[in-house]
């Protein structure tokens, strides 16, 4: 049930960010670590321009939205696990900024299908 959005600098092509391999490992990691039922949904959104500290810079940000009731410690643990996974699939090491956010879905959330 997790909703995962990966925003990334468009110029990080498959040689610099292996999105397919990352997604294959990300889904089971998030479902297992968050103790979620169902399957995760992952959306990749390329951004033509990304800036860090006012300078154009490559960047990858993962947002994970879950149903409420996870503790801050559980969310932090999941963020750390996903950040470590990102490090395995984003080439360029410290030259690419990576971040992860785990948040609750709003009460209005509904799913069909």
PLM region descriptions:
Residues 1-113:
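A domain-level signal for the structural core that forms small-molecule/cofactor-binding pockets
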């Amino acid at each position: 049930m997790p909703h995962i959005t990966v925003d990334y600098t468009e110029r990080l092509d498959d040689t610099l960010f292996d999105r397919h391999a990352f997604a294959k490992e990300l889904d089971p990691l998030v479902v297992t670590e968050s103790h979620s039922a169902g399957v995760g949904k992952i959306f990749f959104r390329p951004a033509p321009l990304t800036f860090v500290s006012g300078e154009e810079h490559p960047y990858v940000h993962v947002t994970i939205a879950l149903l409420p009731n996870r503790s801050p410690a559980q969310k932090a643990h999941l963020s750390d696990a996903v950040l470590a996974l990102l490090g395995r699939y984003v080439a360029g090491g410290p030259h690419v900024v990576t971040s992860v956010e785990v948040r609750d879905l709003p009460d209005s959330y509904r799913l069909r299908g």
